[in-house]
């Protein structure tokens, strides 16, 4: 073809949703280049693979490109985007490029407000353990693979489906999981929860007639859309009517044990499961992977091994080990990407279950002024459930400040609620020192947020344990 695509350039290459697609395309034989505003471990890893990376944005970076891929985080006035349009080079949204990748395989798409990354990772791990060698594109680093993405030789591709910008409506999977539907990213849907629910129905109806929807019917909004879903459905959850149901759930030294009843069209023997993750929310995530395994006729032995040996995902209840505390003893440091009150509630409960009787210190950076405004009272409530709170200013993520939706306002409201006395840390750069100063022996310190707080745990480790490797991930 005269206009064959050989060289693809990514604007915002370091983003969690972009780097994986770029890596898979690179391994398919395309020439890949990309740029990002700041240097990162992701850019350095991609450069080591042979991908041409640039820090900063300039029109010259797209030289020779046949297509330019952008995410919704990239503004239309980006010089590389402007240059591409001037030169009539196709500018392709990230979701459309992901949809093109999915055309090469049988797609399994994981959607939902919370739990997408962990669920996608669990499904990927189950397929891999069964010898199906899936391709995957995940929004976090799968620890067992050391990457966000991999080009497999099998027939399946497992991907996250992003509802935040409605881009999941571009995907055409043959199997779709929806973990839950909650009010988040509501600006995309005109602050209309009904429109958000309808978008999920539309997403499910993107599947072919032989596709299967795997839905968590514990979630009220998913229950509400069920009458509108016309494709075959497998339900999962703790509810009595769930076709793939967990019972006898209990925490066990940072893991979860439970029994699974499988009644989705065919009665299979119950399974006694050990899941190498903490928290009941992760039991639900595992149930979706079990439902996928049933649909694909994956042997129980492979399924159980994958769940018991799961090595986790970067920034999802990621453990950094034991660190020396002021006054003697050690404290446990954990990082989690959760930044919505529902996610935070589940993660705090998981920490309580994994470390019973220990003081729980929450270090939290709110993400986006709009979310802080929309979920203000819920944030106050969930922070009040911790034993101590270190709270930073809001990570703007490109948004303009909103009156009374900033970190100080949130700290005042938590203080007035009277459950805990928060410590407000105005400068995120000071947070590592404040954590070190406030942590006592026996504490569990949980760093939560989707913004720049992601760099804090490693800095705490560097500060307190300079004589050992800088990071210990998971178990």
UniProtKB/Swiss-Prot annotation:
This is UDP-N-acetylmuramate--L-alanine ligase. Pathway: Cell wall biogenesis; peptidoglycan biosynthesis. It is an enzyme of class 6 (ligase). Disulfide bonds: none annotated. Its EC number is 6.3.2.8. GO terms for cellular component: cytoplasm. GO terms for molecular function: ATP binding; UDP-N-acetylmuramate-L-alanine ligase activity. ATP binds at residues 112-118. Belongs to the MurCDEF family. It comes from Paracidovorax citrulli (strain AAC00-1).
């Amino acid at each position: 073809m005269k206009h064959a695509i050989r060289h693809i350039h990514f604007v915002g290459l370091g983003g969690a949703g972009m780097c994986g697609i770029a890596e898979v395309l690179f391994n398919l034989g395309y020439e890949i280049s990309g740029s990002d505003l700041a240097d990162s471990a992701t850019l350095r890893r991609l450069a080591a693979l042979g991908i041409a990376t640039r820090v900063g944005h300039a029109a010259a970076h797209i030289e020779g490109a046949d297509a330019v891929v952008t995410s919704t985080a990239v503004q239309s006035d980006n010089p590389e985007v402007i240059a591409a349009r001037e030169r009539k080079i196709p500018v392709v949204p990230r979701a459309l490029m992901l949809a093109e990748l999915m055309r090469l395989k049988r797609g399994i798409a994981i959607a939902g407000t919370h739990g997408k990354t962990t669920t996608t990772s669990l499904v990927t791990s189950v397929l891999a353990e069964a010898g199906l060698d899936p391709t995957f594109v995940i929004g976090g680093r799968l620890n067992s693979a050391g990457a966000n993405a991999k080009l497999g030789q099998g027939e399946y591709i497992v991907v996250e489906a992003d509802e935040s910008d409605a881009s999941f409506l571009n995907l055409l999977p043959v199997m779709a999981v929806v973990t839950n539907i909650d009010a988040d990213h509501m600006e995309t849907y005109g602050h209309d929860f009904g429109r958000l629910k309808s978008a999920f129905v539309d997403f499910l109806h993107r599947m072919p007639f032989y596709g299967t929807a795997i839905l968590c019917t514990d979630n009220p909004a998913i229950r509400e859309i069920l009458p509108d879903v016309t494709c075959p459905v497998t339900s999962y959850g703790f509810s009595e009517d769930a076709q793939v149901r967990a019972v006898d759930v209990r925490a066990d030294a940072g893991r979860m044990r439970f029994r699974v009843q499988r009644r989705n069209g065919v009665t299979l023997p119950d399974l006694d499961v050990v899941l190498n993750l903490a928290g009941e929310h992760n039991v639900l995530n595992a149930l979706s992977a079990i439902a996928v395994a049933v649909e694909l006729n994956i042997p129980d032995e492979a399924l159980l091994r994958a769940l018991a040996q799961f090595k986790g995902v970067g920034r999802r209840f990621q453990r950094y080990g034991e660190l020396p505390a002021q006054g003697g003893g050690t404290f446990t440091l954990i990082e989690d990407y959760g930044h919505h009150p529902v996610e935070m509630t589940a993660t705090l409960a998981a920490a309580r279950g994994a470390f019973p009787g220990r003081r729980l210190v929450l270090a939290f950076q709110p993400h986006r002024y709009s979310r802080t405004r929309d979920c203000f009272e819920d944030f106050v409530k969930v922070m009040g459930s911790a034993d101590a709170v270190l709270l930073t200013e809001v990570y703007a993520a490109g948004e303009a400040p909103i009156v009374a939706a900033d970190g100080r306002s949130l700290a005042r409201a938590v203080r007035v609620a009277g459950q805990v006395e928060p410590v407000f840390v105005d400068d995120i750069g000071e947070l590592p020192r404040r954590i070190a100063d406030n942590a006592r022996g026996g504490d569990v310190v949980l760093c939560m947020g989707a913004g720049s707080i992601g760099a804090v745990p490693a800095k705490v480790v560097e500060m307190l344990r300079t004589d050992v490797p800088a990071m210990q991930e998971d178990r």
